[in-house]
Amino acid sequence: MKITLLVTLLFGLVFLTTVGAAERTLTPQQQRMTSCNQQATAQALKGDARKTYMSDCLKNSKSAPGEKSLTPQQQKMRECNNQATQQSLKGDDRNKFMSACLKKAA
């Protein structure tokens, strides 16, 4: 009986330690939601105004322009596209340049 109780307590302790140690990291969407919620609270928005603000904020239409997050591939594509535009490349030359530029990052 004592062994069963001891084993049960041991498993319980291990379980609680594991649950407590697993710090939950927020996803980018959850971070954006928290940020937008704090901004809406600071502006004392209520009702439809808050709902509209939250919707726009989560879509990044009212947040800071640099806050919109791009994937590394999208960033590289934007850089290569800007370089191709600066060099006034068109057609097949542009396609070759873009292909080579995007492969450099990989």
Curated annotation (Swiss-Prot):
<dbReference type="Pfam" id="PF07769">
    <property type="entry name" value="PsiF_repeat"/>
</dbReference>
<feature type="signal peptide">
    <location>
        <begin position="1"/>
        <end position="20"/>
    </location>
</feature>
<dbReference type="InterPro" id="IPR011690">
    <property type="entry name" value="P_starv_induced_PsiF"/>
</dbReference>
<feature type="region of interest" description="Disordered">
    <location>
        <begin position="58"/>
        <end position="92"/>
    </location>
</feature>
<keyword id="KW-0732">Signal</keyword>
<feature type="compositionally biased region" description="Polar residues">
    <location>
        <begin position="70"/>
        <end position="89"/>
    </location>
</feature>
<protein>
    <recommendedName>
        <fullName>Phosphate starvation-inducible protein PsiF</fullName>
    </recommendedName>
</protein>
